Amino acid sequence: MDPSSAPQPRSPADRRHRRSRQSHARIRAAARNLFLERGFDATTVDDIVGAADLAQKTFFNHFPTKDALLQELASSVVGHFERLLSDECKRSDSLEARLGGFFSLVGSEIEVTRVLSRDLLHRIIRGSASGGTGNQELRRVRQAFRGVVADGRERGDVGVDLELEVQADLVAGAFIGVVLQWLNEPGYPLAGRLRETANFLAAALAPRRAPGRGT
């Protein structure tokens, strides 16, 4: 056996980096489970480190505050939404099918993880309103929808009478508006409203048909 092909022992720096990654992941997983069960406000840092079986000092080595941890989880949620939309675009060809499929998936996931979703979405929206990092997350959401609309314009199922940026604003604004209404109104029929919104947007953005003769 060639000695050069044998596995090389990890350096102390490599082991420290691996342990750090593992600790980070354990904190995130423990926090997510607790936020899902109790909500953000009812969960303390001591609760999180206890569930993760880590020292409090380790938590603060990774996150300066509990709010910073929630922000990282919120960013991950937006990344998950981006992947869902990308996957839906690979499965479907029309704007109506893409928005309908994506809105349906998101609505189902949000309602299943209701407590956690409320905290994460509130964090994104509050951060945006105060000029914080939530702005970045909302920009990512808008950019993802912009790509879907731009593709629809190229395929011909989205009209070109409005500017692309306006159309992207309409889609992102409608999606966020429905989610906001769900956040603020107990019992709001999120899944149904998202489905209706997707259908409305597809119809509103469809190319205008030229008037027929005699009309």
What are these regions (language model features)?
Residues M1-R38, A42-A51, A68-Q71:
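Basic, helix-initiating cap at the start of DNA-binding domains
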Residues M1-S11, G101, L105-S108, R142-Q143, ...:
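C-terminal peripheral helix-coil segments that are non-catalytic and often amphipathic
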Residues R21-A29, D41-A42, D53, H62-S86, ...:
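An amphipathic alpha-helix adjacent to DNA-recognition modules
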Residues F35, T44-V45, A55-Q56, K66, ...:
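Amphipathic alpha-helical segments enriched in hydrophobic/aromatic and basic residues
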Residues G107-G147, E154-D157:
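Short secondary-structure transition hinges
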